């Protein structure tokens, strides 16, 4: 029991406790809304097709797959536009205040979604517009949210705090889709948006109770120089750059989550409730592996483990793409979550140890363009390929591409292959 309490040492800090509880609630609501939006677009476009002319021939494309892919595009454009600005704000302003205002915007967006859906005025274009606005708010929020953790706990408890924050996402991606699936199947999808609105209000109150006020340690101004400094540091630190490329390639080509409505509805034939259940597989795999890792001592040869975990992610995605069995699909999707968690923990350790605190917000913002831009572009890529060749081919080919690109990163960035554990990076920084 004492050892378990020690692993949750970060929760002893009052401010971090409020942050953690607020984020647990709002992240669950956000995952519910993410599920609902994907299913909403799928239902609005289901069974529709459109034709485009290219190279002298007509190509018939499925609207539902293309529409789901377009969600990725409308999410990634605001991330590219605002993520770097979010990093500068996180290093120059009170991170707590930035988080409050971005959540106010997110709550208003969810409220509008609720009203339009319940009143019957919702359409695909409205969903796209509100999704883009929500992505912009997230882009401005994430650097502050990730960077403030180091301000709320002592350095020796930072790793524990990061692990607990990872646990939030894993639990939310299990509970959120499952709850949303039940609500959509039994009641009205608009209620999911309404619940998300309420969760943002809870998060705003929790963040408002945090006593910490940001104190700028350096003259980090909101300007081009501060922006360029963060970009230069990230791109010149090769081991950080290599880990970001690994993340980007994996999520760009092997992001099967956006195709889940098609897999569940058309291939496996399990409907909205089955879609919600299938969506829990990846976070359950992530949660199980995360718990196992928390019970082990520090791993050795982490660079090779990182590369292997991304390769496993790609192989599991490929098998998921050609599966017609719900059990096999669930198992493979869970395996992608396991591989991603191992990769995420090692990548996060490398970046935190290699980045000075005064640059952390900007490093996070650059990483965000890879971490969040990859999946959203991946949704677009998968949607385009699936609309022409079908969802199974899109998912399978993406998994194979991930394995091949992982091999390229292993060759191009030998510092990743040679990385053993945190002591390697500590020695390099001394």
Task: Say what each PLM segment does.
Residues 1-430:
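Alpha-helical transmembrane-bundle signature of multi-pass membrane transport and export proteins
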């Amino acid at each position: 029991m004492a050892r378990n309490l020690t692993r949750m040492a970060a929760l002893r800090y009052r401010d971090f406790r409020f942050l953690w509880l607020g984020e647990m609630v709002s992240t669950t609501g956000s995952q519910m809304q993410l599920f609902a939006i994907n299913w909403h677009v799928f239902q609005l476009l289901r069974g529709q097709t459109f034709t485009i002319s290219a190279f002298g021939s007509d190509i018939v494309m499925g609207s539902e797959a293309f529409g789901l892919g377009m969600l990725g595009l409308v999410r990634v454009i605001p991330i590219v536009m605002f993520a770097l600005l979010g990093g500068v704000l996180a290093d120059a302003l009170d991170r707590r205040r930035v988080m409050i205002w971005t959540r106010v915007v997110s709550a208003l967006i969810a409220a509008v979604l609720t009203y339009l859906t319940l009143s019957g005025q919702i359409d695909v274009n409205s969903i796209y517009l509100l999704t883009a606005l929500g992505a912009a708010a997230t882009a401005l929020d994430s650097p502050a949210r990730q960077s403030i953790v180091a301000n709320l706990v002592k350095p020796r408890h930072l790793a524990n705090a990061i692990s607990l924050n990872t646990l939030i996402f894993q639990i939310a991606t299990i509970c959120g889709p499952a709850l949303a699936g039940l609500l959509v199947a039994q009641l009205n999808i608009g209620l999911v948006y309404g619940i998300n609105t309420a969760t943002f209000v809870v998060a705003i109150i929790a963040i408002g109770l945090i006593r910490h006020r940001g104190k700028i340690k350096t003259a980090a101004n909101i300007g081009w120089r501060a922006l360029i400094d963060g970009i230069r540091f990230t791109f010149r630190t090769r081991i950080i750059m290599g880990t970001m490329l690994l993340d980007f390639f994996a999520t760009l080509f092997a992001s099967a989550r956006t195709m889940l409505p098609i897999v569940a509805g058309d291939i496996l034939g399990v409907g909205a409730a089955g879609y919600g259940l299938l969506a829990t597989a990846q976070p359950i795999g992530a949660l199980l592996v995360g718990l196992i890792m928390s019970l082990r001592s520090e791993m050795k040869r982490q660079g090779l483990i990182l590369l292997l975990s991304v390769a496993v992610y790609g192989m599991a995605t490929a098998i998921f793409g050609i599966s017609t069995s719900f059990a096999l699909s669930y198992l493979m999707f869970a395996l992608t979550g396991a591989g991603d968690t191992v990769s995420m923990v090692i990548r996060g350790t490398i970046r935190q140890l290699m980045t000075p605190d005064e640059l952390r917000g900007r490093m996070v913002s650059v990483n965000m363009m890879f971490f969040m831009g990859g999946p959203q572009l991946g949704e677009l890529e998968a949607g385009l390929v699936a609309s022409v060749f079908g969802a199974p081919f899109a998912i399978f080919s993406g998994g194979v591409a991930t394995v091949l690109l992982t091999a390229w990163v292993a060759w191009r960035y030998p510092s990743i292959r040679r990385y053993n554990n945190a002591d390697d990076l500590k020695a390099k920084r001394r």
